[in-house]
């Protein structure tokens, strides 16, 4: 038994879209078969049935009504699937044999344009990536708005990942032979991104002609070949899926990565630039604070501003001056914002014009939006700042387009462009004539009904219409005896009525329906002409839309500045960040008003190059460091900042190593991830960079961690090619000695008040280092049981009272020196030798464990509880031991660490149950018995 003709056709079509779920049009339904049906039935909760197809077993099948397809398509695309739409390409009633069918569109996560499934304030980007030798090129397009951006650089995985993080594409198009290991890296970091592959020749085929045809501003001599290949590959994929050239993609914008502030993937996450760490939502992010935009276009543009802060002084100051002028003209700003509220999403409406999917109601929205532009232009002429004056000069009021739409379209047209009721009276004579004929015909129908009621005496008689029988006279069965014999022609019998027609009724029906059909056809043709005229002027509307979005962003920044008492920062060229009474923009919004403690900051590349911050857990060190970075980012966006005064040096890059998390799936422990991040910072930071390092070295033993932290500080300060502005928070109080030995290191700490045995964290950053961590007090605040807290205090007092001071003395390091001498007491060496094998055994048998570290205001990591060397000084003569140091020196002056004290301090009480707490206390008590 062979396949049925329909199933043969289905399989032939399916062969061309193996990676898609095929929606196969059969009558009024889209049907899915075989594996597609199984997937769709599961994802869409549809009943899975079967259909005879000529095989031994029935083909699995499920289907959806074609008129409801958008909802189902949206759900599948949101889940990451691609959908191929196969339509009937001819009228089934007129065809002989199997109906001709073909794929008219492929819908993918990166090419989806249904506004009901897109976030209005977020772009839906699709990205292409092309690699060639040691170079890479990337292009990003949003086909719903017409944006198309390209860039290139030397190939580094980190660079590509940073750009992906910045644009957050839904889909990435790659050359099919790209290394699977790199694809795995992308998927590992961005699991929700869909990956699509195309052949190498699709990136290069007819490259210059394709780009010239698509982009009005393309000049083949201005772009590197690798950039052109990336752009061409993306255009190929868009055409392959959309099956036509989209006229709203008419301009290619090349940008250089180094023209914007670089914020790497980890820093974007740690600083919560556009989404918070916990729920991955906008609330609690910098974007959440700054976004008071009134248009969807402005919301998307503000996100781009935040993702790409500027690094050139003039454009930054232009934005700041414009925001200042808005704040000095509040009434004008309010009028401007009021008009912005009436503007719809011009970019996405003209995107629908380009894809021929716009309806008349959306064009009315476009008309209303354009109608506000002359008023906005008038407001702009009242300002004096360069940015507003340039906008006023460049904005196109689009009066010709507004005039056409206002004259041609009804204010409340039909939703469907193929149902008529679109064109305004007076725009087209033929439309007016047909409408009159249609209206007169319906008046005749109404008069016929009244006449028949009077002549027959049947008050319930009515003249009705349906698509099957046309117009008819309906009389209930109770009144059939009143119907004059021979007056009507019986057409249909119902359970409670009879339906009749008359020759004159059918004659009028033909006139009315003919007029309606012709009217709908003419209105549709007129609508397409109007749509074509708008399409010819898409680039004009896009330019105006971009200016409106910029205005909206500036108004948003002014509104936020006014609401939150922000000030205008001064942008300097002195490599100095000076902030007086700075505040964290997000934290101050989520705590009661007035409770946030402001702090000063001074960081430069000379005497205050590395700010070493010590202090207890939960005191606010991480919040303070993030605050400095966010204020810097805000200033480079062109925003006012939360401070009393701010003098901001432009940074080229911001790096953070805050918090800790395991990457166990990739076989990387907390410490490994931490070291990878620190390595990335040291390799890529420059003297213009701002670096935030929090608890470097905490993921390993105290000696190892302290050594690494110390050497990182030396490397940053002593490397003449680096010397970046750095905030360095640590629990290693021994590092405070570096202020005396390394130029540029300055000690700061978080102020703590001790009142009647109670600890109060003042969250104030003060000059000087801290001398203790208050670990037990933090444990108390976290709710560890009172017996555990009290006993821990007793043990700590006993150990500290019994412990003798010990030290490791190291001479100050010198740049480029490769060795140094550590003075170690004999007792220290003996203790080290006695414990060496035990420590080695513990280290080898220890399992990597993960601790998720969040903002210090809620929780901080307590270091590893590996056994440490108990170094006691007993007054014996010191000996010298030569220690080789790899590329930089480690200098210890005093280490006062006891094995048991360290274990107590390192208890992670936030991740312990009360019973685990008691067990840990019992274990510590047993260990103290051996002290004497």
Curated annotation (Swiss-Prot):
CDD domains: ABC_MutS1. GO terms for cellular component: cytosol. Keywords: ATP-binding, DNA damage, DNA repair, DNA-binding, Nucleotide-binding. One of its GO terms (biological process) is mismatch repair. ATP binds at residues 615-622. GO terms for molecular function: ATP binding; ATP-dependent DNA damage sensor activity; damaged DNA binding; mismatched DNA binding. HAMAP family: MutS. This protein is involved in the repair of mismatches in DNA. It is possible that it carries out the mismatch recognition step. This protein has a weak ATPase activity. PANTHER family: DNA MISMATCH REPAIR PROTEIN MSH1, MITOCHONDRIAL (PTHR11361:SF34), DNA MISMATCH REPAIR PROTEIN MUTS FAMILY MEMBER (PTHR11361). NCBIfam families: mutS1, PRK05399.1. Belongs to the DNA mismatch repair MutS family. This is DNA mismatch repair protein MutS. The lineage of its organism: Bacteria, Bacillati, Bacillota, Clostridia, Eubacteriales.
